[in-house]
Amino acid sequence: AELTEARNLQTGTVYIAASEVALRCLLLPVLKQYRLLYPGVHIRISNHSTPQAIAALKDGAADIAVVTTPTVRSASLVETVIRPIQEAAVCSSAFPALTDRPVALSEMLDYPIISLGPDTKSFAFYSDFFTDHGLPFHPAIEAFTADQILPMVEADLGVGFVPNEFLESESRVCRIDLKEQIPERQVVLIKRKGQPLSVAARKLEHMIIDEK
């Protein structure tokens, strides 16, 4: 059996549906290690919003999905929480009034908000966050992917919300010290219930879960 498993890890393809945030905040170093261990396995990554990734998983176009909460619950899927991520409000130096003091969430409404589109769970997350504080959420600019938000903020187009991991080597934007705490999100791994993974996909699943 061990010989068969080793042989199965020399070839084959693993299909991953991943959101941009999950890719950057969790997956990339795992994939690097996986490639070092199993260079013969092909990795196919499709970049999706969370709902799109889950749809790809249900359709059989992906072996596993790695996305951020909130997710789309389904009786046919199994979800494993891997790690929390914390997001921050950011702006450029073009908005100095937001950078030198604690800022109320309501003040963000005075500036153009950059967000992902309404068909994403990120939009739903921030819509709920604003609603919970009695505020409307009407972004002025909609980005197609999460990694577009930071360049738009850098270009002085408005304010946005990005994971702390996006800011670790980023000095061209300013964190906004929000008075209200942005709720934590989770990176989760999702797979189809009752459907066995290939040896190569199962090995990657275990490596991702080991990041917990």
Question: Where are the regions that the model predicts?
Answer:
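A late-sequence structural motif
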Residues: 26, 177-212
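Alpha-to-beta junction loops
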Residues: 58-66, 87, 135, 153-159
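Ligand-binding cleft/hinge of the Venus flytrap
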Residues: 30-39, 106, 123-136
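Beta-alpha-beta core module
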Residues: 74-85, 147-194
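Alpha-helical "hinge/linker" immediately C-terminal to small N-terminal DNA-binding modules
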Residues: 1-8
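Central regulatory/effector-binding core of bacterial HTH transcription factors
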Residues: 11-73, 142-143
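Secondary-structure junction motif
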Residues: 97-98, 112-133, 197-205, 212
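Flexible hinge/capping segments at coil-to-helix
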Residues: 74-113
